[in-house]
Amino acid sequence: PFCNAFTGC
């Protein structure tokens, strides 16, 4: 649902 180091975007 959002961008982060684990899922990307």
From Swiss-Prot:
Q: Which cysteines are disulphide-bonded?
A: 3-9
Extract one GO cellular component term from the record.
extracellular region
Tissue specificity, in the record's words, reads:
Stored in pericardial organs and released into the hemolymph.
Mark the transmembrane ranges.
none
A GO BP entry = neuropeptide signaling pathway
Which UniProt keywords are present, listed alphabetically?
Answer: Amidation, Disulfide bond, Hormone, Neuropeptide, Secreted
- Top-rank taxon: Eukaryota
Instruction: Answer yes or no on keyword Disulfide bond.
Output: yes
| Cell compartment(s), UniProt | Secreted
Residues found modified as Cysteine amide: 9
Q: Which GO terms describe its molecular function?
A: hormone activity
The principal localisation class reads secreted
**Function, in words:** Cardioregulatory neurohormone that increases heart beat rate during adult wing inflation; has no effect on beat amplitude. The effect of CCAP is both ino- and chronotropic.
Q: What is this protein called?
A: Cardioactive peptide
- Organism of origin is Carcinus maenas (Common shore crab)
Lineage per the UniProt record: Eukaryota, Metazoa, Ecdysozoa, Arthropoda, Crustacea
